[in-house]
Amino acid sequence: MTEIDPNINEQEMAEVINSDKDIDSDSNTVGLTLFAQLQNQLRLQQEELLQQQRELLSQESHLQLLQSSHSSISNTWNFTQGLVVGQLSVIFLIIIFVKFFVFADSSSSIPSKFVARDGAGVIVRRDNKSTTSRDRHNGIGGKDSNLEPSTDDERLQNNRAKVSSILEKTYYDVNNHASESLDWFNVLIAQTISHLRTEALLSDNIYHSLSNFLDNSELPDFLDKINLTEIDVGDDFPIFSNCRIKHSKEDTGRLEAKIDVDLSDTLTLGMETKLLLNYPRPLTAILPVAMTVSIVRFSGCLTVSLVNTNDQEFQADQVARPSNGHTSTDNGNDENGKGSSSEDKKGGTALMFSFAPDYRLEFVVKSLIGSRAKLQDVPKISSLIENRLRTWFIERCVEPRFQVVKLPSLWPRTKNTREPAKPKDSDDTL
């Protein structure tokens, strides 16, 4: 803008102002035209860029289509190739299996001597490992250590080694361990005896079984039929206490449990019969006899141990048993012995028990003899019956004799599986 001279008049000042306005308007029009030209150039450049982008996108899409077509062709070929190879491999394996396993020649199979050792190769025998290490320490070859012991000394050493291993792994000191009370065992035995009493008294089972036994027994000619008059199975239970584990006195390498047993109860069996006098002629005289025998007290030391029925000492005892002079007292169990002989040959685990000679057994014998003039509680008869019962007990259960009861198999089986009965729904009861 031009500087205004203060000496100029108003008309000149107006002209100057108008000239300035014209100059400003001209400059504005020039700026607008320039701005419009720039906008047109920008639009043209943007359109060119968009066209180039479209061309690039079209080229990329075309390339992707080409690549996808090539990959699909290769994938289909790989899938077909894998399918064919898999089918061929399966057919090849089936042919090999049928040829070498289904139609294999029996002569080319494994010999029997190697087949018998398959189980030994599968089952881990820790005893063999311990004996092998022990034999190597003693200078014995490894091949001979796997053989079964052929002498009693070797078997005794093996039993001692097993017993020492058991005591070591269970942390039980035979010499210093305190005796146990066996309270839990008393509860289990009491429950078992209670169930047995219930079954015995149910429908008079014990009466019928004893009556059948007496009827089938062979009686002497001077005895008439025996009738049962009283049966009392008691209501108390034995108490086991003071249990301690000891080594066997016979030096057999076994462990045995010594348990004190005490029973204070009344177990009664009453019967009546007739004595027949058959001289000089049959049934010359008849003498009625009524008798009641009760066991009121028993206490003693029970020795229990687990044994193997295949041991030589038990096999020798079974062979020598028929030559024993007391076999006549077991006439009622001959059939059971014959039936169990086949089971004894198979062997297995058995429970061996016996009582110490210092046992205590008290009887109460009541007798009544005669028809009109009766003799009551004859001491001679009481002592005779008591001695006979003691002899019967000593010959079977008092040391050095013992009883061997074969234990059933504890292996779980389907036929032994049970489950609790489900209670009926309330809708069914209604």
Curated annotation (Swiss-Prot):
Compartmental location: Endoplasmic reticulum membrane
Major localization listed first in the record, in broad terms: endoplasmic reticulum
Cytoplasmic membrane side: 104-430
GO BP: mitochondrial genome maintenance; mitochondrion-endoplasmic reticulum membrane tethering; phospholipid transport; protein insertion into mitochondrial outer membrane
Membrane topology, from the record: Single-pass type I membrane protein
Pfam entry (one): MMM1
Keyword Electron transport: no
SMP-LTD domain: residues covered: 178-408
Biased composition (Basic and acidic residues): 126-138, 335-346
Transmembrane segments: 83-103
This protein's record includes keyword Electron transport: no
Sequence segments annotated as region (Disordered): 126-154, 315-346
Keywords for the protein's UniProt record, in alphabetical order: Endoplasmic reticulum, Lipid transport, Lipid-binding, Membrane, Transmembrane, Transmembrane helix, Transport
GO MF annotation terms: lipid binding
Sequence ranges on the Lumenal membrane side: 1-82
Record's GO cellular component terms: endoplasmic reticulum membrane; ERMES complex
Family: Belongs to the MMM1 family.
Description of its domains: The SMP-LTD domain is a barrel-like domain that can bind various types of glycerophospholipids in its interior and mediate their transfer between two adjacent bilayers.
Its job: Component of the ERMES/MDM complex, which serves as a molecular tether to connect the endoplasmic reticulum (ER) and mitochondria. Components of this complex are involved in the control of mitochondrial shape and protein biogenesis, and function in nonvesicular lipid trafficking between the ER and mitochondria. The MDM12-MMM1 subcomplex functions in the major beta-barrel assembly pathway that is responsible for biogenesis of all outer membrane beta-barrel proteins, and acts in a late step after the SAM complex.
HAMAP family: Mmm1
Subunit record text: Homodimer. Component of the ER-mitochondria encounter structure (ERMES) or MDM complex, composed of MMM1, MDM10, MDM12 and MDM34. A MMM1 homodimer associates with one molecule of MDM12 on each side in a pairwise head-to-tail manner, and the SMP-LTD domains of MMM1 and MDM12 generate a continuous hydrophobic tunnel for phospholipid trafficking.
Protein name: Maintenance of mitochondrial morphology protein 1
Organism: Lodderomyces elongisporus (strain ATCC 11503 / CBS 2605 / JCM 1781 / NBRC 1676 / NRRL YB-4239)
Gene this protein is translated from: MMM1
